[in-house]
Curated annotation (Swiss-Prot):
Its main location: secreted. Inhibited by peptidyl-argininals with Pro in the P2 position, diisopropyl fluorophosphate, phenylmethanesulfonyl fluoride, leupeptin, antipain, soybean trypsin inhibitor, aprotinin, ovomucoid, valyl-prolyl-arginyl-chloromethane, glycyl-valyl-arginyl-chloromethane, p-aminobenzamidine, benzamidine, zinc chloride and mercuric chloride. This is Spermosin. It comes from Halocynthia roretzi (Sea squirt). The active site is at H178 (charge relay system), D231 (charge relay system), S324 (charge relay system). Residues 130-372 form the Peptidase S1 domain. Residues 54-64 have a biased composition (Pro residues).
Length: 388
């Protein structure tokens, strides 16, 4: 099994996207960040990657796989120009132009003295269609953070949201590895944007620079296989996240415990809504979980809950482009737990049969290696190989 790959970030260049073409790097630094992960190399035939197309009711359809210049449908957005200025909250600190700004110790101790999974405002669970455009109550999902680059135009901060992410500790967020499929060596400068609700105003938004990315060692994102497994990336944040009314931490689930089939969980994001409105605000969708057996029947016989869980059987209720890496939250004992990471699904959002999510509960042995003193990790033995 390949060693765990950690990619440290420096510099600022143009944004890539998984639904558009990849622009050439403009990294001003001569020393490229270290990485051992091979970049994605698609075959020469038409093939795609994320959210493979599912024609009709056939249980095991042949996926269509796009070329690298015509990337996957699940779920980042379009490329943007290089940033021209720092976000307001970053201006007070100088950047290290000689290399990445990183904590010295990779296996560092996380301040575990915090509460998780309790929002300052209760979400309205009576509505829920991302594709249908149901807006979330502001501050009701404070663990969700947009992820991408930024620009400043006319003195106004403009976020180029590419994926979603979830804050899980004061120094970490979790997203999908395939969000970096077109930029595996991390040639750009990325941020998570905490407290974001409306992308047209960015009122109260706090950018937090991503200074490290760690892929799951068993992910196949950077291979030719269109059926993603272990679609995880841990994001290390430059600034400590201090919880407040606008941002907070999601709870990690109990190890190897997934809610039963039929449980209603929730996914949130800023993804597109198929021209149904609400593209600029945080939206939410109700997702009913399905069994591993049904997930195998709809997608691939080798799917296992160790890497993937599935859900979302109601027509028209789905995540969509721009929601990749975002959360699947399930509520238990009054708290919200991060059970899944948005990975792939039907190429036409909401058309069925269901979406696939990276399974958090079965990957805590790997995840907890890098935040061992979290309450959720106390009794979990670290396994850096990702074997679960």
């Amino acid at each position: 099994m390949a060693a765990i790959n950690v990619i440290f970030i420096s510099g600022a260049i143009a944004l890539f996207a998984l639904t558009g073409s990849c622009s050439e790097s403009t990294n001003p630094f001569t020393n490229k960040p270290y990485a051992t992960q091979n970049p994605y190399s698609p075959p020469q035939t038409n093939q795609p990657t994320k959210r493979p197309y599912q024609p009709g009711p056939a249980p095991t359809p042949a996926p269509y796989i796009p070329q690298k210049t015509n990337p996957p449908t699940k779920r980042p957005l379009n490329p943007t120009p290089s940033p021209t200025a720092k976000p307001p909250s970053e201006n007070s600190e100088s950047e290290n132009s000689e290399g990445p700004v990183l904590i010295e110790e990779d296996h560092f101790t996380v301040d575990a003295n915090f509460k998780c999974g309790i929002p300052p405002v209760e979400p309205d669970l009576k509505k829920g269609k991302i594709v249908g455009g149901a807006e979330a109550v502001p501050n009701s999902w404070p663990y969700a953070a947009a992820f991408g680059t930024y620009d400043i135009s006319g003195g106004k901060l403009e976020v180029s949201q590419m994926c979603g992410s979830t804050i899980i500790t004061p120094r970490h967020a979790l997203t999908a590895a395939h969000c970096f499929m077109m930029d595996p060596d991390i040639d750009q400068t990325y941020y998570i944007f905490m407290g974001l609700h409306d992308e047209t105003t960015y009122k109260g938004v706090r950018p937090n620079k991503i200074v490290g990315v760690r892929y799951h060692p068993k992910t196949n994102v950077f291979t030719d296989d269109p059926w993603l497994v272990y679609d995880f990336a841990i994001l290390t944040l430059r600034k400590k996240v201090i919880a407040n009314f606008a941002w907070n931490y999601a709870c990690l689930p109990q190890p190897k415990k997934i809610p039963p089939e039929g449980t209603i969980c929730w996914s949130v994001g800023w993804g597109v809504t198929q021209n149904t409105g609400g593209d600029n605000v945080l939206k939410q969708v109700a997702i009913d979980l399905v069994s591993e057996k049904r997930c195998k029947e709809e997608y691939r016989s080798t799917i296992t809950s160790k890497s993937t869980i599935c859900g979302g059987t109601t027509p028209g209720q789905d995540t969509c482009q721009g929601d990749s890496g975002g959360p699947l939250f399930c509520k238990e004992d009054g708290k919200w737990y991060l059970q899944g990471i948005v990975s792939y699904g039907p190429s036409v959002c909401g058309s069925g049969p269901m979406a696939a999510y990276a399974a958090v509960a079965y990957n805590l042995e790997w995840l907890c290696c890098y935040m061992p003193n979290l309450p959720s990790c106390e009794d979990i033995e670290c396994d850096e190989s990702g074997e679960n």
